[in-house]
A protein has these predicted regions:
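N-terminal/domain-start alpha-helical segments
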Residues: 1-103
């Protein structure tokens, strides 16, 4: 699978990149929302993992850009915000699942 990881925290980004790569996936990464939007609107990805709180534009805006581009690529939203309303907001914005950090 080809996976896009959009995560501003270098340690988390590298952890995900390494783990997914070792599992045999091709991984591209971005460290901010604007770069994430540029990459995420490309239909080549099978799955996207997007942090909710990113510099330049937040992860929910990245997810919205993906959906506005007409892409149905599955999106996993990562966030330290774990309240029920945070999860509901993420899913309503177009995320397919929501994972609370730390994991």
């Amino acid at each position: 699978m080809r996976i896009l990881v959009v995560e501003d925290d270098a340690e988390t980004r590298e952890y995900l990149n390494r783990g997914l790569s070792e599992a045999g996936h091709v991984v591209d990464t971005a460290d901010n929302g604007n770069s994430g939007v540029s990459l995420a609107c490309d239909p080549k990805y099978d799955v996207m993992v997007i942090d909710r709180m990113l510099p330049e534009c937040d992860g929910l805006a990245v997810v919205q850009a993906v959906r506005d581009a007409g892409l149905s690529t599955p999106v996993l939203i990562l966030s330290a915000l774990g309240e029920v309303n945070d999860r509901v907001t993420g899913l309503r914005q177009g995320g397919d699942d929501y994972l609370v950090k730390p994991f």
